């Protein structure tokens, strides 16, 4: 949830791949990419209480940036994460990325509350949404797009070797004491 004159919600890594939804001091929204800026539409203005969203398909590299459950791309508000159409940007798939929020500058106080699925009320500032992903994980204000999961460890695949599994690391590694068959230790 945003309360800022300047707000940026972004997905980035150390390479040239980066994208962000930017709410500037005039309240106009734009998508910023590493190589420049594209204006979404002149009639779209952000305001206090807006909810900004990121849906990232790491297999295809498609990033969907949204505000109040509408997903944008440059020149249109027709992004559909569930069908994979009209992403805000397509970036290099299968890399490590960071998600961030930045509030900066301007004449008013800025701030934001980030919900990765822990509290759809945004610390009591909204009525609870009560939406979870397909695995029943999370508490989101808006419904999670079909095919997307909350960003958390409980949505990672189970490991095949580990403390909670029937297969243990020491099943594959063992110490064997060897006693030589001859007096000089050769075998």
Where are these regions (language model features)?
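Polar, enzyme-active/binding microenvironments
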Residues: 1-187
